[in-house]
Amino acid sequence: MLDCIVNRFVAALICLSVIPSLASAADNLGVLGSKPKWSVLENYQDTITHDEFAHLINDVYCTHGFAQDLIKIENDAAQILTNRESRTTFTLRFASDPISKARIPRLWRPAKSLPSAQPDKPLGGLRIALDPGHLGGKWAKMEERWFQVGDTKPVTEGDLTLRVSRMLASRLKKLGATVLFVRNSTQPITSKRPGDFKELARKILIKNGLPQPRPDVLDPSDPEKQQTIRWQSEMLFYRYSEIRRRAVLVNTKLHPDLTVCLHFNAEGWGDPANPTLIDNNHLHLLVGGSYLQDELELDDQRFEMIRRLLSRAYDEELAISDTVATSMAKATGLPAYQYPTTLTTTKVGSSGYVYARNLLAPRLYRCPVVYCEPYVMNSKDGFARIQAGDYDGTKQINGVDQKSIFREYADSVAEGLAEYYRNARRKGD
């Protein structure tokens, strides 16, 4: 689920330098970020032309602009600032023309590099990781991905996404894919827990102008809960530590050709014990990009952006996302979500349903990522369909015959992936 209104206090976390206890004072990193290994980019020398690099920087990754000393695009190379204090830079050489480009080092395989597959197995040989968003279970209330209407079954996003991922897995396997789970239970991937981040949370709050932060939240409706050590330490656990550990799993053990992140969307519901149900229901997908200027100031995010750009994940994930979005739109009949602001996103692709946005998982996962955000959980229709659970065939909900929302989700993603790879794989092998 994406928060439709960005909380400025929370957003400020992203722009903080790491506290000296976690990194040297000269490091300029995001929350729980790692010091960049700029030498890794040597592997990408001569793999991209000037025009390709300039296009991806200006039209995809840095659509909100950037400080001119961060990235200087010259005729034959780009100068990328690695440390503002020391003024050191990394020189990325461009290939002189498309024919002379060196091979791109990456573990994932683009569709066009795969041999043709059997008609009924368009995903044959493909490694697909499924990443059901959030945690659910006992963590759902902490994540603020929980609400309940009266005596009905609570709606918990992490449990919903896990249910969809298991259904999707069986469909992808039938289509020939090897399916890997980033998460297949309600247990966190990270070994850390909120208590491990209390001291860091306290320092972050002090750095943000709260010299004596409160230790605990008074109640769920506490208007100042985001200024408490408890709330911040919980966020450091479930948002930052958890997603970073998932990235380690994806990048060092699973090595997928594609990761599918499964979410349900929502709009502000107010009191989770007495939530507001709304008429709006919509769909959109996300790809990595559209970095904010403040985000680009952080050394680790700038490094991660350049590394991802050079891997060419964007071209692959956009094409896949457009195809999956079209499949999901046809199956669900949902309109495209329209962000209320363009300050954090950039609309991309041809389907009308895909946006570029700088989210942690698509930034860190070293492969193409399809990030799905269908259905508004607290819409009247979405809520009714979630309450109806899973079932065969169709059931009349709000006067309309509808499939199980879980099967509709899984089927439409599987059909979109099958269509993309069926058309994009090499022909005639």
Annotate each predicted stretch with a short phrase.
Residues L2-I5, F9, S24-D429:
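Catalytic-site microenvironment of enzymes
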Residues V10-S21:
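Bacterial N-terminal signal peptides
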